[in-house]
Amino acid sequence: FDEAEFELSPREFKDGMDQDPSAVLVDVRETYEWDICRIDGAQLMPLSSFDPTTTGLDPETTIYLYCYKGKRSMLALKELKRAGFNKLKNLSGGIDLWAEEVDSDMPQY
């Protein structure tokens, strides 16, 4: 499993989502983090209770995942991959780097 093939920089992540309106954006942080800031259009699915079989996600849809720094979202990505999902993208650097490189108005924590 090569994590690098699923990693996108914040700019690549944004461009990919912008070009694919059917893609799904998943935030795997906890609710208290979601309440501070989030990327518009995201669905909250905390890693602490993440189960690929009950997410309702379509294996044929491209799924963009993020967390605070990119580690938890990679764990969720690996679970989805094991469950048969193949169109998966992870935000390298997480929402923290996103706030620096894409959305400077976003609160950081």
Language model: regions and residue ranges:
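Rhodanese-like catalytic fold shared by cysteine-dependent sulfurtransferases
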Residues: 1-24, 31-62, 68-109
